[in-house]
């Protein structure tokens, strides 16, 4: 074991000498208190270490001890419902062990409890041939998730022994005869966070991730296995949007990373999630959630670790054939931590002081999203979706973190402070947002809703763009100076904005909108548009079209349940629309 000595301390960065024989990204214990750090640079016998805990009080001359292993996470039963810090230390366990609301420096608590016994049900038998990724048994970890115990990476052979019963994560549940000898299989694995977990290959992203949010699903859809960015200034609704995604997305597991954000936002998640019901399983949402809390008052170096810890945990669940949503709030804070560490290392700064390798670091993270064919002899498919919030100072989307993120992700949900001030939520700007997955996922929508889904969506988008062009004229001369046809377009665009795009996150029904309901709502508004144009062409007054009472029914449709709306209200609204607009024709 390498033992060195501290020669320099600069905030979270420590320089130690006598470290010959150490490896890059090796975890070390720094100082007399044994603070956790990671080697990020090696020159001859000196090592530069980023420390994941507060360095106040340590001094030159204190020891640095290598562990011989990279920064790794423990993967196994017991992660769901847990709350970790950025380096996978369990916060609840630390509180119980230390009887303190603060994290003591140098504290060491296992990430996964060694005391809890889990009921292991074998799905393989002695004599079976197994390879990396094969499922040999299951554990009912929570009411929502059956945890699959897999053969770890690099192990293949014949099962010599496998037993059912209650075991801790460190006890042997199976023995595999390999070419190198017998290997004992535990329920827990370890994996280095900076190394992506392997798979057989990536699949095309052709299935949409249904979030229940109309603007995201219908207009700017994200595919399963895709990556998305949510940039927006302060108060525009980034965190609530991410909470909505965590609550309603069509996934099996949610990994929520609070990376450098305010502590009260994580508190909201911790207080709210245990009381929320999961629409897929009927159980509590927390049963399928892993929380990583790395708030703004925690050491900056741990922000980078928290992002890698979260994606490694997400990949582990993906390898079980599950769908995972990883939300990182916010990647800007992680980039700011990189900027601080880079400054301490006296590296040449890039744009706005960020390091020159900012884009490659962001790409390494987002590239770990994907829909994959999992390792193993079974035909398992899993996916990881990444949704990263970006907090550009002053809402400036041209700043380096936002612009570099845009080069990597294929979905851009741009939050607009002006919309938020007008109380239009979700405040996703339909003119600046985009999705490059629309062509890929259109087939699924047409198969599961109706063949005209794509044409309705494209027509609605063009109406909203046309409205933006007309607004300049309206502000100069007023709407009455416009031709009748364009006055109808303005009215329909307003209905699209207020009755379709606006959604109440705190309303019992409107918080989640199913794909079929989304299609029918859009269909009704676009039918009103076509019939309104016909009526105007036949002599109806646009002011009369704006005054019909069916518009009230259209405005209320978002608050109706699927069953009531699709089966009862849709034909009623269409009939009422036809009779009222027909009566306007002279």
From Swiss-Prot:
Keywords: ATP synthesis, ATP-binding, Cell membrane, Hydrogen ion transport, Ion transport, Membrane, Nucleotide-binding, Translocase, Transport. It comes from the Archaea. GO terms for biological process: proton motive force-driven plasma membrane ATP synthesis. It is a peripheral membrane protein. Its EC number is 7.1.2.2. ATP binds at residues 232-239. It holds the Pfam family ATP-synt_ab. It is found in: Cell membrane. InterPro entries: ATP-synt_VA_C, ATP-synth_a_Xtn, ATP_synth_asu-like_sf, ATP_synth_asu_arc, ATPase_a/bsu_AS, ATPase_F1/V1/A1_a/bsu_N, ATPase_F1/V1/A1_a/bsu_N_sf, ATPase_F1/V1/A1_a/bsu_nucl-bd. Its main location: membrane. It catalyses: ATP + H2O + 4 H(+)(in) = ADP + phosphate + 5 H(+)(out). GO terms for cellular component: plasma membrane; proton-transporting two-sector ATPase complex, catalytic domain. GO terms for molecular function: ATP binding; proton-transporting ATP synthase activity, rotational mechanism; proton-transporting ATPase activity, rotational mechanism. Belongs to the ATPase alpha/beta chains family. Has multiple subunits with at least A(3), B(3), C, D, E, F, H, I and proteolipid K(x). Component of the A-type ATP synthase that produces ATP from ADP in the presence of a proton gradient across the membrane. The A chain is the catalytic subunit. HAMAP family: ATP_synth_A_arch (MF_00309). This is A-type ATP synthase subunit A. It comes from Methanococcus maripaludis (strain DSM 14266 / JCM 13030 / NBRC 101832 / S2 / LL).
């Amino acid at each position: 074991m390498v033992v060195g000595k501290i020669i320099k301390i600069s905030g979270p960065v420590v320089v130690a000498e006598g470290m010959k024989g150490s490896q890059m990204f090796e975890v070390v214990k720094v100082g007399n208190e044994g603070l956790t750090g990671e080697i990020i640079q090696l020159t001859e016998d000196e090592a530069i270490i980023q420390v994941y805990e507060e360095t106040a009080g340590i001094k030159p001359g204190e020891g640095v001890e290598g562990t011989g292993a990279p920064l790794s996470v423990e993967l196994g039963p017991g992660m769901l419902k847990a709350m970790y810090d950025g380096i996978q230390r369990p916060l609840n366990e630390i509180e119980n062990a230390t009887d303190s609301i603060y994290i003591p420096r140098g504290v060491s608590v296992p990430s996964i409890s060694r005391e809890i016994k889990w009921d292991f049900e074998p799905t393989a038998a002695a004599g079976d041939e197994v390879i990396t990724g094969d499922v040999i048994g299951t554990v009912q970890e929570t009411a929502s998730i059956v945890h699959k115990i897999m053969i770890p990476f690099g192990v293949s052979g014949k099962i010599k022994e496998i037993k059912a019963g209650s075991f801790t994560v460190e006890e042997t549940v199976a023995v595999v005869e390999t070419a190198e000898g017998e290997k004992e299989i535990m329920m827990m694995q370890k994996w280095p966070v900076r190394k992506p977990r392997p798979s057989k290959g990536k699949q095309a992203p052709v299935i949409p991730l249904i979030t229940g949010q109309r603007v995201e699903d219908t207009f700017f859809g994200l595919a399963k296995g895709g990556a998305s960015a949510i940039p927006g200034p302060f108060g525009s609704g980034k965190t609530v949007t991410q909470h909505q995604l965590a609550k309603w997305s069509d996934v099996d597991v949610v990994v929520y990373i609070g990376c450098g954000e305010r502590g009260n936002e994580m508190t909201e998640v911790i207080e709210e999630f245990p009381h929320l019901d999961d629409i897929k399983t009927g159980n509590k949402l927390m049963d399928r959630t892993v929380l990583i809390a790395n708030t703004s008052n925690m050491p900056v170096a741990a922000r980078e670790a928290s992002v890698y810890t979260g994606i490694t945990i997400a990949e582990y669940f993906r390898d079980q054939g599950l769908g995972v949503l990883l939300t990182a709030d916010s990647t800007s804070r992680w980039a700011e931590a990189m900027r601080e560490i880079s400054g301490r290392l006296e590296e040449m700064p890039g744009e706005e002081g960020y390091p020159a390798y900012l884009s490659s670091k962001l790409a390494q993270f987002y590239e770990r999203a994907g829909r994959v064919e999992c390792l193993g002899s079974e035909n398992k498919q899993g996916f990881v979706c990444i949704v990263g919030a970006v907090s550009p100072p002053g809402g400036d989307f041209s700043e380096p973190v936002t612009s570099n993120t845009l080069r990597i992700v294929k979905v851009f949900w741009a939050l607009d402070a002006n919309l938020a001030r007008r109380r239009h939520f979700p405040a996703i700007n339909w003119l600046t947002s985009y999705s490059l997955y629309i062509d890929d996922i259109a087939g699924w929508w047409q198969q599961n809703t109706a063949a005209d889904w794509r044409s309705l969506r494209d027509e609605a988008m063009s109406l909203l763009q046309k409205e933006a062009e007309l607004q300049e004229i309206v502000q100069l001369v007023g709407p009455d100076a416009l031709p009748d046809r364009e006055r109808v377009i303005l009215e329909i665009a307003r209905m699209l904005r207020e009755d379709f795009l606006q959604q109440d996150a705190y309303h019992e029904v409107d918080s989640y909108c199913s794909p079929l309901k989304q299609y029918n709502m859009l269909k009704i508004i676009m039918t009103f548009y076509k019939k309104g144009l016909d009526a105007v062409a036949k002599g109806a007054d646009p002011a009369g079209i704006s005054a019909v009472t069916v518009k009230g029914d259209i405005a209320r449709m978002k608050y109706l349940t699927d069953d009531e709306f699709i089966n009862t209200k849709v034909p009623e609204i269409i009939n009422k629309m036809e009779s009222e607009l027909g009566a306007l024709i002279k």
